[in-house]
Amino acid sequence: MPISKVYARSVYDSRGNPTVEVELTTEKGTFRSIVPSGASTGVHEALELRDGDKSKWLGKGVLTAVSNVNNIIAPALVKANVDVTNQQQVDDLLLSLDGTANKSKLGANAILGVSLAASKAGAAAKNVPLYQHLADLAGAKTQPFVLPVPFLNVLNGGSHAGGALALQEFMIAPTGAETFAEALRMGSEVYHNLKSLTKKRYGASAGNVGDEGGVAPNIQTAEEALDLIVDAIKAAGYEGKIDIGLDCASSEFYKDGKYDLDFKNPESDPSKWLSGPQLADLYHELVKKYPIVSIEDPFAEDDWEAWSHFYKTAGVQIVADDLTVTNPVRIATAIEKKAADALLLKVNQIGSLSESIKAANDSFAANWGVMVSHRSGETEDTFIADLVVGLRTGQIKTGAPARSERLAKLNQLLRIEEELGSNAIFAGKKFHNGNQL
């Protein structure tokens, strides 16, 4: 089924920044996709094209990317008469129009918007749900489908929040649930308990939420944050059923080969900065003391030695985000160096659906886990909910169970689970091996 029209416009993300929306039309109708954007972005990511005109949107406009869709991509895609169900052909055309390694000519935000809208049109052309079409494209098993464990970011630190806390995300993972719906209820109840406890201990304003819906109290250390979360889990009555995940985003506090856990203090004392092995010891202590099952970006994006050293003895899932930025070349290096055992999959880091699927399949081939992820600047687009089910990864992180741009994905997963009925299983404790269930 050919594409008759492609049109892009500038809309806004959850932080009030401009982002690209693409509408792609076939005889089945018009299909829309909105591109997200990140706050802590890896240096090896595909390029998100921003206008840089400081007189508009403080330099963050995306009119160039929008114009690239409307004036370069749209005519080429319509003229090429590609079948919208052939995602690889669509993406190959987009990549050839750009011609750069990091999509800097047209912008990853322009290319991705078209790529994702095409996949929605492809599903409609086949009269199947989007997750089924994505499973077909990935060659994934669909008997049964796997619903993911939601890693819910309930407490924020690092670059996502004020306060001295260096680590960026503290997530709860309801691995002891029987279904996705039950997991989300458990997560929601813990979240509300956490909000009440936080306000009690840190004052009413501590209940205010960060970019991803988590609370951001003025907490100094990781232990303090983890104690608060464990207390909330106990208060909700789910001890032993809810585990914890961390996203350290360590590249944000890596300075001169050391890790500065006091990086938000301009007067930080360099004699207290930690070496890679010292930071690894801190993680080991946390894993011993708390029900932590997953640690993302424990070290900086080019500190390969620290990653490999820690992975040998970690004993929990080690997720690579800034290290790999969903890039097949970086993933291959991480696999070879035994630096991690799970990929954080962000479609806008690599900038096309076909490349994202390849990144996931490369990871599965090495017995890695894959966690599908939102970005901190999100929208009402629910694509990643279908993606996590289609790819069968068994784990997703899409913020707290609060703020509509986060709930949009979680609610879509509720719908998918209901629609699949007995052809759905919940990943639960086996979230790391979702694709093998």
UniProtKB/Swiss-Prot annotation:
It is found in: Cytoplasm. GO terms for biological process: glycolytic process. Its EC number is 4.2.1.11. Keywords: Cytoplasm, Glycolysis, Lyase, Magnesium, Metal-binding. It comes from the Eukaryota. Substrate binds at H160, E169, E296, D321, S373, H374, R375, S376, K397. It catalyses: (2R)-2-phosphoglycerate = phosphoenolpyruvate + H2O. The keyword Metal-binding applies. Pfam families: Enolase_C (PF00113), Enolase_N (PF03952). The keyword Lipoprotein does not apply. Homodimer. HAMAP family: Enolase (MF_00318). Belongs to the enolase family. This is Enolase. It comes from Kluyveromyces lactis (strain ATCC 8585 / CBS 2359 / DSM 70799 / NBRC 1267 / NRRL Y-1140 / WM37) (Yeast). The lineage of its organism: Eukaryota, Fungi, Dikarya, Ascomycota, Saccharomycotina.
